[in-house]
Amino acid sequence: MIKILVSNDDGVTAPGIKALSDALSTSYQVMTVGPDRNCSGASNSLTLTNPLRINTLSNGYVSVSGTPTDCVHLAIRELYTDEPDMVVSGINAGANLGDDTLYSGTVAAAMEGRFLGLPAIAISLVGSTLTHYETAAHFACKVIAGLLKKPIAQDQILNINVPDLPIEQVKGIRVTRLGARHKAEGMIRTQDPAGRDIFWLGPPGDEQDASDGTDFHAVTNGYVSVTPLTVDLTAFEQISTMQQWIDKI
């Protein structure tokens, strides 16, 4: 049976990882390993200064005292004797669109799976109330079945964003590019009980590039967005230009 490793960044007890694991377990052998707390915004960070501790929950999920990247690395390298066939990260409670992908622990967990040689996808539910996790799980299963039949390039993952709608109201699936947000709003300054200044990150910026063809545009218009992301960050098209620039300095 096909084995799928499921992880996330919202934490191993979050509703999204349960909805995803439950949906996948009807067709695949599922191994669910997630962080013991909410790690949203953890990106590709690793825990390097503390040991990782694990705890197996009553439902069989494994909780890890680390980041999403830690979870995937530990699961593949140590926790299971049989390597999974695929890594699926999510379902994230909220969008991973445009610039979000740089900070996303959900996307990072999928990236780590791909770094370790496995096909991987990240899936997120986009909306204000976040009630239709079953819709995101449905489309995750659909994409996974397609990947198992026809794999994508080995240096890519798929970043999937699903509108928070009933399944029958989703208009279809669009392959997209990343859009862009305006810069995040400023820091929020407040005081702790002792009167000392403390700071919170401001909310993310509004869409700057949500034109046709972007992930923002697809989801806003009721479509599932599937964006191929490359693990290799090299800007290959700039190498020749950069060499000319270097030669002149």
Swiss-Prot record:
Its cofactor is a divalent metal cation. This is 5'-nucleotidase SurE. Belongs to the SurE nucleotidase family. A divalent metal cation binds at residues 9-10, 40, 92. Keywords: Cytoplasm, Hydrolase, Metal-binding, Nucleotide-binding. GO terms for cellular component: cytoplasm. It comes from Shewanella sediminis (strain HAW-EB3). The lineage of its organism: Bacteria, Pseudomonadati, Pseudomonadota, Gammaproteobacteria, Alteromonadales. The gene is surE. Nucleotidase that shows phosphatase activity on nucleoside 5'-monophosphates. It is found in: Cytoplasm. It catalyses: a ribonucleoside 5'-phosphate + H2O = a ribonucleoside + phosphate. Binds 1 divalent metal cation per subunit. Its EC number is 3.1.3.5. InterPro entries: SurE, SurE-like_Pase/nucleotidase, SurE-like_sf.
